[in-house]
């Protein structure tokens, strides 16, 4: 266990960041699953815009890697084009 006050504070801050990042990642994953289940192209396109924004924001904040965000956006775009 940490002995110094600053180390204890870092542990608390890291735990808070971890929870926030996990929430963001889970929200993003849920939105992606919803997009994959949509059969209507117009609805998929509108949902795609929000998912892309979520992925870009997550990549910008280093929650996910930027290449993973790019690959996911590419796969989702291919999925929408197949509808």
Swiss-Prot record:
The keyword rRNA-binding applies. SUPFAM superfamilies: Ribosomal protein S20. It holds the Pfam family Ribosomal_S20p. The keyword Phosphoprotein does not apply. Keywords: Ribonucleoprotein, Ribosomal protein, RNA-binding, rRNA-binding. GO terms for molecular function: small ribosomal subunit rRNA binding; structural constituent of ribosome. Belongs to the bacterial ribosomal protein bS20 family. This is Small ribosomal subunit protein bS20. It comes from Amoebophilus asiaticus (strain 5a2).
């Amino acid at each position: 266990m940490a002995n110094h006050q600053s180390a204890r504070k870092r542990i608390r801050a890291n735990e808070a960041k971890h929870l926030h990042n996990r929430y963001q990642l889970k929200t993003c994953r849920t939105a992606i699953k919803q997009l994959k289940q949509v059969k209507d192209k117009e609805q998929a396109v509108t949902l795609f815009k929000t998912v892309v924004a979520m992925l870009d924001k997550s990549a910008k904040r280093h929650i996910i890697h930027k290449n993973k965000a790019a690959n996911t956006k590419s796969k989702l775009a291919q999925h929408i084009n197949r509808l």
